[in-house]
């Protein structure tokens, strides 16, 4: 391959890297878990990361059990899972 072809390939790979969003391999695995309100009957505002919509969404948390995809603030959810 000529040096021009190699430079073109390098440029295309660099562009691909820049345009590719953060990979799911870079976020914690628990960010892929579904929202889980838990087994208690509380009524607490919480947030979870929805991997299909690529955003943090609100849900009602019961106050116990559930899973790790559960954040008190949307900012905490974004910092952990959507970055």
UniProtKB/Swiss-Prot annotation:
MF GO annotations: serine-type endopeptidase inhibitor activity
Main subcellular localisation: secreted
Tissue specificity comment: Expressed by the venom gland.
Keywords: Disulfide bond, Protease inhibitor, Secreted, Serine protease inhibitor, Signal
Source taxon at top rank: Eukaryota
Site (Reactive bond for trypsin): 41-42
Disulfide bonds: 31-81, 40-64, 56-77
Protein name (Swiss-Prot/TrEMBL): Kunitz-type serine protease inhibitor stephenin-2
Residue stretches making up the BPTI/Kunitz inhibitor domain: 31-81
Database matches in PROSITE patterns: BPTI_KUNITZ_1 (PS00280), BPTI_KUNITZ_2 (PS50279)
Family annotation (Gene3D superfamilies): Pancreatic trypsin inhibitor Kunitz domain
Tagged with keyword Chaperone: no
Keyword Secreted in record: yes
InterPro entries: Kunitz_BPTI, Kunitz_BPTI_sf, Prtase_inh_Kunz-CS, TFPI/VKTCI-like
Protein family (similarity comment): Belongs to the venom Kunitz-type family.
Annotated signal peptide: 1-24
Organism field: Hoplocephalus stephensii
Function: Serine protease inhibitor.
Cellular component GO terms, alphabetical: extracellular region
Subcellular location: Secreted
């Amino acid at each position: 391959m000529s040096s021009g072809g190699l430079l073109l390939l390098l440029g295309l790979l660099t562009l691909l890297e820049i345009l590719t969003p953060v990979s799911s391999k870079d976020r914690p695995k628990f960010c892929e878990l579904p929202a889980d309100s838990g087994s208690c009957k509380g009524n607490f505002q919480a947030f979870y990361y929805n991997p299909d919509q690529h955003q943090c969404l609100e849900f009602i948390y019961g106050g116990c059990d559930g899973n790790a995809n559960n954040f008190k603030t949307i900012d905490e959810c974004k910092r952990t899972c959507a970055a």
